[in-house]
Amino acid sequence: MIRRKLTKQLEIIKDYLWDMKECVLKIIDDSLIALESKDKNLAKKIINEDEKIIDDYQYDIEDLCGRIIATEHPVATELREILAIIKIISSLERIADHATKIVKVVLLLESDLDDFDFLNLYFKPLREMADTAKEMLSDIFDAYFDGDFTKILKIVKYDNIIDKLFSKQKSIVIDAMKKNPENLDYLLNILFLNSFLERVGDHVATIGELLYFIRIGEKVNLT
């Protein structure tokens, strides 16, 4: 009976975890939509509303995990899973935080985002980095819920794509700074945008490592 109750509570936590992941995916996508379209209302919604939703998910999941540890005394695999989930939701919250930083740049650089170079030279790689991070996050959660942990090992190639894009864009932006020092503030913000998405990729890889550890019980480096 106790074991059945613990299993049911873990399923509830995993349902919350899945929903939190879906919310994070939407925030990443919306942040890029706001950036491309200069949608200040969408940017403000992400900052004022969506970020709170993520915080609420984090609080609720941490609370449920704490209650299970205190009342059900899980051991071995179950305890490992609960402790890993607490770390996973922290990484999800940080991903959402980086997406929020992206939309803050929307409000800061509103007039500069009309620049032809932004859409053609700077935005396309940002979109590619964001889409790659989203695909990574979706794939590792699918692997976790499907029980196919070989898929998690394949996300290394995705993180490599993000790292290469970041490295390339960093070089392009730094070169532009040297040639156009009068645009330093604008270009610094472009560099920050790339940095935010590179960190998103790192956090997704960390989640993959934790999900792999939950089931296999072995540490793996996905970065």
From Swiss-Prot:
It comes from the Bacteria. InterPro entries: P_transport_PhoU, PhoU-like_sf, PhoU_dom. Plays a role in the regulation of phosphate uptake. The keyword GTP-binding does not apply. The gene is phoU. Homodimer. This is Phosphate-specific transport system accessory protein PhoU homolog. Its main location: cytoplasm. GO terms for molecular function: protein homodimerization activity. It comes from Borreliella burgdorferi (strain ATCC 35210 / DSM 4680 / CIP 102532 / B31). GO terms for cellular component: cytoplasm. Belongs to the PhoU family. GO terms for biological process: intracellular phosphate ion homeostasis; negative regulation of phosphate metabolic process; negative regulation of phosphate transmembrane transport; phosphate ion transport. Keywords: Cytoplasm, Phosphate transport, Transport. It is found in: Cytoplasm. The keyword Cytoplasm applies. SUPFAM superfamilies: PhoU-like.
